[in-house]
């Protein structure tokens, strides 16, 4: 075999080295107290004592962005998909009461294109900055034959810490708690197999009447909102009994994850700030209205269960619109009742 046998098999080692050099400046943006060592070691290190947590419990989460990646590839826009990946992970662990500490990413591709992969990792770094987490490691795997040359997949792993006494596991949610919602930025990163089917014959350049002047592709690739900085102060003051990250499965699947089986969520649909893209999906996809709440976030990306006496303090700490969308009630049938 020749000296460049690996390259002939489709793996460009030099391109891999270039990716590492390109992403160093982006990784540097995510530095935070506790990080030990630098990029390129066999393992990322973090000094937990720097968090100041007295009884630390580590909470971890992993996720990807599903077939939203296919739209990023279709529209050749790769600079925000990394933020989606970070958001999906850190929003999950914040729902358990954790302060996210560090993040690792995994990218697999058919062909190592340094400029494109730099955009992806720059998006990851931006998500880390918004979350206050350090990007302490990652892997870029070039896998010709497994993926097409233009294809790639992206996954992430987040680790956070919580005071043992402040873990949010749903046990404190009680009948009478008020449900408060924070707005989503769009579809986020779930339901895209259906989204792609609905808009399969569209170029993405269309400005649909429902989308208020925005191009379809820009709305579909709007990055997932990160809720860490909004939620952490509420957790620190122990103002919330439960948190639900509204992801795949919409309201119906995710809201019950924050309370016990004997309770239910009663939601006033008129209080939900439904985004234009969901109205467009329902219309052009001919999707039953009730099914929309089983698939999408419908405009609410994070939900809190809060004691009535804490509602005003929560609203005071959150420098944004807060939607009072329902109550926790005794279960008498379905776990989520939308009226």
Swiss-Prot record:
Transmembrane segments: none annotated. InterPro entries: PurM-like_C_dom, PurM-like_C_sf, PurM-like_N, PurM-like_N_sf, PurM_cligase. The keyword Nucleotide-binding applies. Gene3D superfamilies: PurM-like C-terminal domain, PurM-like, N-terminal domain. It is found in: Cytoplasm. It catalyses: 2-formamido-N(1)-(5-O-phospho-beta-D-ribosyl)acetamidine + ATP = 5-amino-1-(5-phospho-beta-D-ribosyl)imidazole + ADP + phosphate + H(+). Its main location: cytoplasm. The keyword Cytoplasm applies. Pfam families: AIRS, AIRS_C. Keywords: ATP-binding, Cytoplasm, Ligase, Nucleotide-binding, Purine biosynthesis. Pathway: Purine metabolism; IMP biosynthesis via de novo pathway; 5-amino-1-(5-phospho-D-ribosyl)imidazole from N(2)-formyl-N(1)-(5-phospho-D-ribosyl)glycinamide: step 2/2. GO terms for molecular function: ATP binding; phosphoribosylamine-glycine ligase activity; phosphoribosylformylglycinamidine cyclo-ligase activity. PANTHER family: TRIFUNCTIONAL PURINE BIOSYNTHETIC PROTEIN ADENOSINE-3 (PTHR10520:SF12), TRIFUNCTIONAL PURINE BIOSYNTHETIC PROTEIN ADENOSINE-3-RELATED (PTHR10520). Belongs to the AIR synthase family. This is Phosphoribosylformylglycinamidine cyclo-ligase. It comes from Streptococcus thermophilus (strain ATCC BAA-250 / LMG 18311). The gene is purM.
